[in-house]
């Protein structure tokens, strides 16, 4: 029998406030986000990600995001040793979708801002105005050392100064088609980009440190943050409150989008058994690599994304918030997420993406009050 879970009761005014956007964090790297020998083992391919994003679009997901990873963690699972490239993948996905928003990630140490501006304008054309850019500063030193472009460990403390100049160049080029920006890191001399995007280009970030949030408050359209714990859907609330306060100080409205993994089944016990199975197969060698990398940055404080990822509490899925339970239980927990001030959306991963998205669309989302505004489903995608 499916576990019963109490439904939250909201007034109409609350329901309007609690409409929440849903995105999928596509598996651009092998094995998704489970560092376990017991998890599904697969390589990233365009066909897999096309199927995932088309299915997400069918179930009225609002957006799809891909990360960028240039070197993996190794171990028995070769975790993230095999990765596609974000902009080219999302350009392809933009061409085979029609409604869902598409976001690629720029590893800003590897790509000059003028090139990113032009690539983004191109995918804007492909997608019909559905594209945006996620900017990351880079935290894993070996990704950049292997190419000879690591700027030195002082970069850890200056990376948001670098990103501030980077985004100013982007905004110049997208907004006016030219830039003469002069800074410590970038010098533009009548730099031109045309055509410009058809709509204002959205910029997103994932800052959890004070410096990261200050940057997002000033320049981002919204900010990603990690969920926290297992079946503690509102534990991220202090992070969202910090982001909300930082944005208010900048005179802007920058919502938080929260990262969660969904592990669902018919009953709470069945879902919990999956989760325990994945944890029992944790790839300790790959996890050791993650821990080692998290200790390289001694300049950014203790509140960075990578420090949370490496926390041994739930490193098997990089410590993103984890929702484990029956379909009704997961729906209830996601409605709780939507009730947190400043939380405007969630970015979801799944233990098995194709079946997970289908189960979410058919069995979980219909129970969510914060998604009650959605239209009826059309015929299933092929």
UniProtKB/Swiss-Prot annotation:
EC number(s) stated in the UniProt entry for this protein: 1.14.99.46
Induction / repression: Up-regulated by the nitrogen regulatory protein C (NtrC also called GlnG) and repressed by RutR.
GO annotation (BP), single: alkanesulfonate catabolic process
Positions that bind FMN: 68-69, 134, 143, 159-160, 209
Matching Pfam families: Bac_luciferase (PF00296)
Gene3D superfamilies reported in the protein's UniProt record: Luciferase-like domain (3.20.20.30)
Keyword field contains Protein transport: no
GO terms, molecular function: alkanesulfonate monooxygenase activity; uracil oxygenase activity
Keywords, sorted A to Z: Flavoprotein, FMN, Monooxygenase, NADP, Oxidoreductase
The reaction(s) this protein catalyses: uracil + FMNH2 + NADH + O2 = (Z)-3-ureidoacrylate + FMN + NAD(+) + H2O + H(+); thymine + FMNH2 + NADH + O2 = (Z)-2-methylureidoacrylate + FMN + NAD(+) + H2O + H(+)
InterPro entries per UniProt: Luciferase-like_dom (IPR011251), Luciferase-like_sf (IPR036661), Pyrimidine_monooxygenase_RutA (IPR019914), SsuD_RutA_monooxygenase (IPR050172)
Keyword Acyltransferase annotated: no
Family, as annotated: Belongs to the NtaA/SnaA/DszA monooxygenase family. RutA subfamily.
HAMAP family from the UniProt entry: RutA
Record's function text: The FMN-N(5)-oxide reacts spontaneously with NADH to produce FMN. Requires the flavin reductase RutF to regenerate FMN in vivo.
Protein name: Pyrimidine monooxygenase RutA
UniProt source species: Escherichia coli (strain SE11)
Gene of this entry: rutA
